[in-house]
């Protein structure tokens, strides 16, 4: 076999191994530091899914009653996933995983001997270390094992890439999403909201999008900052001016060419040519 061909095949194999390391080397365990990270969630938003979009991540609170997967009574779970570079499903990175019971009791992870252990904080302020909440990674999911299947809320922080937020339909029902300061939607070329909604309000320079009865497989919001709109408008005006300038230059060149033709007689009207007239007395 040609040496270059062999090296090429080896390189492709290493690339495939690197890209799919989750499949070849196993999913790995969640980082204890991720699970024990501190985050404050809005437990009283009053919707089935509350999504707070920040510059670098999304803090989310989901009502576990209306989730679309993991409904096994013996092992209730909430399963998170994202899309890889080849559009394959892969486990989603979660940080600051917390749970809140309907009565206000909360569960969060704390670091104990280098491991993340779930600690229950009761409404009277007392705490207890109990294994009621756990997280594992499979080849294509990050699975949160819930304390209960019937009620409660799950709070997680998820990564965000650029100015787009895309979520599978983890729960059905009402959604609301707060975008970062100065973020807006509305210009088709710069933004997208799917499924669409006309329920949009602005408070403290943050746009709030709301949906009722969501059962779509995916929720996608792409937004722009107001300064992006000014930049885009400036570019559009610049492109228009360049186009007008080009048209004016072309028009002037055309007029100059016509003038030169007239000067050398190339545009003389053939009806005025004496050679085409009949001899005298025969006209």
Where on the chain are the PLM-derived regions?
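N-terminal pre-first-transmembrane soluble regions of secretory-pathway and organelle membrane proteins
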Residues: 1-102, 272-282
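Hydrophobic alpha-helical segments
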Residues: 1-30, 177, 203-283
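Non-cytosolic head/periplasmic domains of membrane-anchored proteins
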Residues: 29-41, 105-169
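Context-gated lysine
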Residues: 55, 160-163, 259-260
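Secondary-structure transition/turn motif
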Residues: 61-68, 112-113, 147-150, 212-216
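Solvent-exposed beta-hairpin/edge-strand motifs
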Residues: 72-128, 169-195
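Generic hydrophobic, helix-prone segments enriched in Leu/Val/Ile
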Residues: 91-96, 123, 154, 221, ...
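Intrinsically disordered, low-complexity linkers and stems that provide flexible hinges
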Residues: 128-148, 157-231, 235-237
């Amino acid at each position: 076999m040609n040496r270059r061909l062999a090296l090429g095949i080896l390189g492709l194999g290493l690339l495939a191994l690197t890209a799919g390391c989750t499949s070849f080397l196993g999913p790995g365990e969640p980082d204890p530091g991720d699970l024990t990270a501190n985050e404050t969630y809005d437990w009283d938003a009053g919707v089935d899914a509350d999504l707070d979009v920040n510059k670098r991540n999304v803090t989310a609170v989901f009502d576990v009653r209306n989730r679309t997967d993991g409904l096994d009574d013996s092992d209730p779970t909430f399963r998170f996933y994202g899309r890889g570079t080849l559009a394959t499903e892969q486990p989603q990175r979660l940080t600051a995983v917390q749970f809140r019971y309907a009565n206000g009791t909360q569960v969060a992870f704390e670091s104990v001997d280098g491991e993340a252990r779930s600690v229950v904080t009761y409404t009277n302020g007392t705490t207890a270390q109990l294994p009621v909440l756990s997280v594992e990674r499979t080849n294509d999911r990050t699975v949160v094992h819930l304390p209960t299947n019937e009620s409660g809320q799950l709070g997680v922080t998820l990564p965000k890439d650029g100015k787009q937020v895309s979520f599978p339909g983890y729960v059905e029902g009402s959604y609301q999403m707060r975008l970062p300061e100065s973020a807006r939607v509305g210009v088709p070329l710069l933004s997208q909201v799917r499924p669409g909604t006309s329920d949009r309000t602005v408070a403290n320079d943050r746009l709030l999008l709301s949906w009722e009865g969501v059962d779509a497989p995916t929720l996608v919001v792409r937004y722009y900052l107001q300064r992006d709109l000014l930049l885009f408008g400036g570019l559009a005006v610049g492109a228009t001016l360049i186009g007008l300038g080009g048209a004016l230059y072309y028009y002037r060149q055309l007029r100059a060419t016509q003038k030169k033709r007239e000067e050398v007689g190339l545009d003389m009207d053939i009806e005025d040519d004496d050679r085409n007239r009949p001899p005298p007395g025969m006209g």
